């Protein structure tokens, strides 16, 4: 798939453009560089980060198989995000169940020395473009510090219980993920109105379910 220039952020006198590229079209050097940058961005030497477990191999695996938004400067990657397809299961007040085609946002990170320049906004602009063009709903798991940013962009905080559909135990609650989930409805099935106070269930994967 061809890359596509989708959004820009002006930083330090230069214009940086986020480009969209599928995992299958990433060369190994770019893929490895993105992984290293994201790992470093999630690591907090002070130990005060929300991401106490840092960025795991499973976390990186979750970011593969979909579209990546990349911003580079002088050949070095300075911002990254990805959106991958998942299914979210939701049952409305009428009892009807829905398996919603979801664009799930992963591995959004900006290199430490480039934070505060609007690069994260440019990455999210690109990822939201993918969500609006290909999915029924967007979703992501956000840290407390990031909540105001997503709310300002129109994402909805999920207030109801969260759960995961496991291969051996059926639906299992994920209380540790309650109130960290945000959704962005963009093309819901006719007649469906989400009630964010109800339960929502994600598909199974290794590592963190959400």
UniProtKB/Swiss-Prot annotation:
The enzyme's E.C. designation: 2.3.1.-
Keyword Nucleotide-binding: no
Binding annotation for CoA: 108-110, 115-120
Residues noted as binding substrate in the record, renumbered to the chain: 54, 106-107, 141, 176-177
GO biological process: one example: response to antibiotic
Molecular function terms, GO-annotated: acyltransferase activity, transferring groups other than amino-acyl groups
Principal EC category: transferase
Protein name as it appears in the record: Aminoglycoside 2'-N-acetyltransferase
Source organism per UniProt: Mycolicibacterium smegmatis (strain ATCC 700084 / mc(2)155) (Mycobacterium smegmatis)
Lineage, opening ranks: Bacteria, Bacillati, Actinomycetota, Actinomycetes, Mycobacteriales
């Amino acid at each position: 798939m061809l890359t596509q220039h989708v959004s820009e952020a002006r930083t330090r006198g230069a214009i940086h453009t986020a480009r969209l590229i599928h995992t299958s079209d990433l060369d190994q050097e770019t893929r490895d560089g993105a992984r290293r940058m994201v790992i470093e961005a999630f690591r907090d030497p002070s130990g005060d980060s929300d991401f106490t477990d840092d960025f795991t191999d499973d976390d990186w695996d979750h970011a593969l198989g979909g579209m990546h938004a990349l911003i580079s400067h002088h050949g070095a990657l300075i911002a990254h995000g990805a959106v991958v397809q998942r299914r979210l299961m939701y049952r409305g007040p009428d009892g009807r169940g829905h398996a919603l085609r979801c664009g799930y946002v992963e591995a959004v990170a900006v290199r430490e020395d480039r934070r505060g320049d609007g690069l994260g906004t440019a990455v999210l602009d690109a990822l939201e473009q993918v969500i609006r063009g290909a999915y029924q709903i967007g979703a992501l798991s956000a840290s407390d510090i990031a909540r105001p940013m997503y709310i300002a962009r129109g994402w909805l905080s999920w207030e109801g219980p969260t759960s995961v559909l496991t291969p051996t135990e059926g639906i299992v609650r994920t209380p540790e993920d309650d109130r960290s989930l945000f959704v962005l409805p963009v093309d819901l099935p006719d007649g469906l109105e989400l009630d964010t106070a109800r339960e929502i269930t994600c598909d199974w994967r290794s590592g963190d379910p959400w």
